[in-house]
Amino acid sequence: SYGGYAALVAASRSPNAYQCVIAGAAVTDPQMQVDYYRYRLRGSSKLEQLAMWDDSISPLTEVDKVNVPVLLIHGDVDQRVPVDHAEKYLAKLVDAKKQHTYVELEGADHFSNTLFYNHKTLLYSSILNYLADECGLENGMMPATSPTKIEPKVAQQP
C-alpha cells in the first residue's frame, strides 16, 4: 500500500528518473483512505496513525506529470486499501492518455499471504510481461533482446 503509493508519486517526478513503476494496492487518494479508516476505526487509538496522510501528496492530482509506464495491480476485495483507489487512478490515467497496464486480482485481498495460486500466477506473469514489454527488462533483470511472453495459467479452486 505505501510502496504502491510511493511508486505512483515517483512516476510523476523528474522525467526519466525511472523506466517504469509497479504499484500494488496503492493509496491514490490519501484523504479517501483517511476517511475509510476513520469510519472503520471509530474511536480507536489507531486514529493518530492517520496523521501521516494529512500532508501527503495525492497521486490523483499528479497524473498529468506521470512520465513512465505504470503497472497498477489491485485485489478487488482489498480490506486495507479499497479497490476504489485503483479505479479512480485508472480513470485519471485513461483521461490523461498515459501508458499503463491494469491488473485486477478477482477475489484477492491486500496481503500476499491471502492470495491463491491463480492470483499469484496472474500477478507474477503480469509483472514479468510488463517488465519485458514496457520496461525493456527480460526476467526483470537484464535488457530484453527478445521478450518472452508468459501466459498466465489460472488454476481452478476445488
Spell out what each predicted region is:
Residues S1-P158:
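Active-site-proximal cap/loop segments of hydrolase catalytic domains
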